[in-house]
Amino acid sequence: MSHSKFIPTVSIQSPVHHTNIKVQSTEPSFKKEDLHLISKDSLESDSESPTQKIKSQSDLEDQIQDNDMEPDSLEEENLSETEEEASRKAAQRAKKENLHTQDAAAINSRQPTEDKYSHIRYDPNWKSKKEEGKLLPVEALPESVDSSTENLTLNPLYPSKEPSMDLSAGKGEQKSPRSTASLLGSEFVSPNYELSTHRTEPFSVLSDSDPEEKSSNLSRYLKSSSSRSEAFLPGSRGPRRRKSKQYFVEKNKLTLGLPTPRMDSYLQLHNKKRGEGHLEQISYPVRVTDKTSIQNARETGNVAIDPEDKWHQRAQQLKDYQEHWSQYEHEKSSSGPRGQSSETTNGQQPSRKPAKHKIRKQRRHRHGPKSLVTEELVVSQGNQNNTPRHQQNPNKPIDTEVTQETVVIMNATNDDLQYSSVLRSQDPTVTSNQYAPLHQISDKVLYKNPARYYPVTNANRERGHNDQEEKRFSYQQLHIDTLSDMHLNYLHELNKKHPSGSQKGSQSVSNINRQASTEKKKQPKLAYTETKYKNLEILWKFHSSSEEQPAKASPDSRLSQIMEQHQQALLQLTEVQPHEGASPGLTLPPILPRVESESQLSSERSQRNQVKISRSNSESYLFQLEKGKKHRKRSSIKSSKLKGYQNRDVKLGGLGPDLESIRDKMQKLIQQKEYAKQVKEYNMKALSIPSKPQTAITENKSAVPRQKALEYAKTIPKPKPSNLSDQASKEKKTPTHAGKEDTLPEISLLEVLQNRHEREKQAVAAFKVLHIV
């Protein structure tokens, strides 16, 4: 009866849903909880002893522990003694209560319920199970799984990350399962991947040939388990305590000088943020082309490695792969520069994103003119693939070349600051003009067309950019030379391929190639001065006008506008430019002066400095442009010797000090001092002498009006003594009046008035009394 009384509590808290066991085993993502789901058949057919069950269970969990253990095993030794005692008591209870597991399982099979808190239970006897599991061999894992699942018991609720499930029975006491999170530490490690690599066929559903499904299922499992466990973590004290101990151990390691992994490194924070726990997803981009890296990733995944070491190892593999790929592309492009591209020859056409990444890496690891040659060749190969499209659309011969070249070159130069000028110059109009016929290129710098597009070549723009960055000249000059050679070679080959190109154009390109090589041999120092243009203002005007163009215009409309502009420029050239027989005085308008002193030059010098460009069979536009640069160089050298720069007031000194000049200077100084003394003395005398007569004059001036006033006063007649008589009469009257007052008679009216006043006073007093009462 004791068992029957306790049945409802066990069935309510049972963590197993027996109807879902087979469905969960067929899922591709094999969760750790599936190890501890108990089937009905295994519970009824089990006949092993409790000790063998405990050993098989510990063997299974030891195998899981070996697969999932990270190098923070010091954490296990730092557990408190109270937990060890509790684990021993729980182990003794487990041996007594395992006898009732079959009855409880039979009852639970009738009332199947699903435990929502199965993933946060904790087993305090994990250490005793671990010690017993060491006695059994590892090979007993597949056979002991069915028996070990019977003895898994349920225990009180204690929060943890990845628990294993047990059933409870008997006296009603609950036994907590073992938590793998206590073995693994505070770090959340992906259990699905590592377990699937070590388990045998009864346990693993996925095969080794499905690494992508593994990674997807792994990410799904990590998200679900982390979302469930994080809901109960705030109230738990276990993980926080383990974390503090782990940090304490790492601090001790740091004090001893031992290497310790950084717990707050960028890699771990990134993995926590994205939910990635293993190296499998890092090796995914390489898996597309190199299948050997998958095996290397599996081998490295079996060993416990520091995440930083894994990161560096993967970075080294990627670097080696990029170098191998760049060498392969370089060999393919050098063997057949006009053949198919290296991406299409392999039979596999990778996506656009890895191609961008590869070219960007190639620019990082392979600096210098060699990488530039390979990139230009890749561009040319990409354009060669579009030749059938050119044959189908003869009216649009440059559109597809524009799209291919801009994609490759713009992505190849994003990470290098020294090639920022190339990035600015690689707009569609310019790249399309690189492969246009020669007469179109010859109109780029001469005229500003009405549609205001940006007619500047890559070499010219980079040379102008070198004026602002003279520190990087030595490195970028090689880049300019290689670019100019590449453009000339492309022009030469395209003029051979285009039958519509005239003989004049091909001759001019060949002359360019010959003269460029001879000038590089004869004049190596000319390159730096060539970059200093005086027509930079014109180039910047074209640049600003090109930026103001609306970006929404379609490439077809742009191409049609460009063709019309070239035709108009050709007509203007034929009208303005002289032929060979014409007079040499007819030239282009003068270039804007950059220095104020150049206005002092004579008209003959300014005519000499102007660029004389004529359309002839023997000379091309680029050759004539270089001639103009030479003239500009000469003019810049001469402009430094003009009168405006010279200070003609300065007199050069002799070989030593001149005594005569020093004596003359000393005499002048002495004379100046003497003259100053004389002037001072004269001024002092002049100031002291006129001060005395001034005082006398002032005294005389003040005395004169006084005397005049006295004389005038004497002339005034004296007044009569009337005032004195009045005063005497007054004095006489006052005593008589005082005597009269004593003798005056009494006035009757005054007495009447006084009596009346007294009566009125009494009346007023009576009114006051009446008013108060």
From Swiss-Prot:
Residues 353-369 have a biased composition (Basic residues). GO terms for biological process: axoneme assembly; brain development. Keywords: Cilium biogenesis/degradation. Residues 59-84 have a biased composition (Acidic residues). Residues 216-229, 598-610 have a biased composition (Low complexity). Residues 1-247, 325-373, 496-526, 596-615, 713-743 are annotated as: Disordered. InterPro entries: JHY. It holds the Pfam family JHY. Residues 10-28, 48-57, 145-154, 334-351, 500-516 have a biased composition (Polar residues). Residues 29-43, 112-134, 728-743 have a biased composition (Basic and acidic residues). Required for the normal development of cilia in brain ependymal cells lining the ventricular surfaces. PANTHER family: JHY PROTEIN HOMOLOG (PTHR14726:SF1). This is Jhy protein homolog. The gene is JHY.
